[in-house]
Amino acid sequence: MNAKKRKGSAVERNIVGKLRDKGFAVVRAPASGSKRKDPIPDIIALKSGVIILIEMKSRKDKEGKIYVRREQAEGIMEFARKSGGTLFLGVKKPGVLKFIPFDKLRRTETGNYVADSEIEGLDLEDLVRLVEAKVSKTLDNFL
């Protein structure tokens, strides 16, 4: 495994560990470089019936754009549709880790997807709060 893939794998493992610590059931399912024919997101996290799907991308520089190839994007969007999960692009740049809802990505003329630096994302704590808000039950749920 080359250094770039090792670093990306380390980021994914770190996120998996943090989500587990927050009570999620988590699977790391990296497919890049493998012989898998069916595209799947890098991280699948579940908590009380809520499914979060994360495709991770990293950059060495803070300002560069993050691209997802059309074929990969279509495959993981189909996985999200079939699973009922919410798909995020996890972006790791120097000093930055954010999770962008996939539907906020911009589509290029060639059909690829791109995350500009200006696109707002959630940090890990905000992502956890989003899920916990979906699973929290109030008295109104039982009336």
UniProtKB/Swiss-Prot annotation:
Cofactor requirement: Mg(2+)
Domain of life: Archaea
Keywords attached to this entry: DNA damage, DNA recombination, DNA repair, DNA-binding, Endonuclease, Hydrolase, Magnesium, Metal-binding, Nuclease
CDD domains: Holliday_junction_resolvase
Site (described: Transition state stabilizer): 57
GO molecular function: crossover junction DNA endonuclease activity; DNA binding; magnesium ion binding
Binding positions for Mg(2+) per the UniProt entry: 12, 42, 55
Top EC class, one word: hydrolase
Phenotype of gene-disrupted mutants: Not essential, it can be disrupted.
Catalytic activity: Endonucleolytic cleavage at a junction such as a reciprocal single-stranded crossover between two homologous DNA duplexes (Holliday junction)
Enzyme Commission number, as recorded: 3.1.21.10
Keyword Chloroplast annotated: no
InterPro entries: Hjc (IPR002732), Hjc_arc (IPR014428), Restrct_endonuc-II-like (IPR011335), tRNA_endonuc-like_dom_sf (IPR011856)
Catalytic-site annotation from UniProt: 32
Co-factor note (free text): Binds 1 Mg(2+) ion per subunit.
GO terms under biological process: DNA recombination; DNA repair
Function as written in the Swiss-Prot or TrEMBL entry: A structure-specific endonuclease that resolves Holliday junction (HJ) intermediates during genetic recombination. Cleaves 4-way DNA junctions introducing paired nicks in opposing strands, leaving a 5'-terminal phosphate and a 3'-terminal hydroxyl group that are subsequently ligated to produce recombinant products. Hjc, Hjm (Hel308) and PINA coordinate HJ migration and cleavage of replication forks in a coordinated way.
NCBIfam families in alphabetical order: Hol_resolv_Hjc
Subunit structure: Homodimer.
Family: Belongs to the Holliday junction resolvase Hjc family.
PANTHER family found in the cross-reference section: HOLLIDAY JUNCTION RESOLVASE HJC
Name of this chain's protein: Crossover junction endodeoxyribonuclease Hjc
Name of encoding gene: hjc
